[in-house]
């Protein structure tokens, strides 16, 4: 019998608690300016690029059916998303920037995520990546996701209407139900005992802690600009 329903419920609690941490509150309260927004956008571009690395790394050691689910999951982000008219991260998005341009806290988080994807058991690594999408699912997060809250703040503080904001931000305003369903099927099949359940919970907890470091570092640096 699958343990996934109870594990999923625990992940949902973890995700909502994540929004109450000091680092995420800092990101959600630092005053926005065009300069600060551009700084965050650069770091989120590399965040997206790191997601592509991590999903691929997990696929390397995952069973064949899980590789298929990851491949299906990644087609929009890596190759072409019709909602954006392009992949989620392109060479043009990265431009001449390198990971070494990121602030140290963000660079450390990027390396930590990649370490988890490469070195942890595949199920734990899968949970590391999955939880970052789960915490942006407005069907789970109470009070609006990080993306939704920042979009609203751009409207209020900078007068930038939703339709005029970055297309990648607009795409992530709505939970990707199809992607979630793909991975729900995987977790339902594989989370069948306490050992597997603990792997998923451990991977999710690790990743949420890493993301706190990422956003906390970026928010602190944003506050020092201007």
Say what each PLM segment does.
Residues 1-226:
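Non-heme di-metal
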